[in-house]
């Protein structure tokens, strides 16, 4: 009976360790996904700015060119 208790305890202990490691990896993955989403949003905002600035420059240049 004692060996059965020891075996059961060992199985439960290893199961908890395994579960703990899996949960830690999930948390790290979620953090990485959050950082990746923020980086993608920042990249999209910068590319929108890059598309907008030449348009704005040509518009201002056109207005200044017509007044001269």
From Swiss-Prot:
- Tissue expression as described in the entry: Expressed by the skin glands.
Reply yes or no: does the keyword Acyltransferase apply: no
Residue span(s) of the pro-peptide: 23-51, 68
Localization per record: Secreted
* Any one annotated GO CC term: extracellular region
Q: Which residues form the signal peptide?
A: 1-22
> What protein does this entry describe?
Preprofallaxidin-5
Which species is listed as the source? Litoria fallax
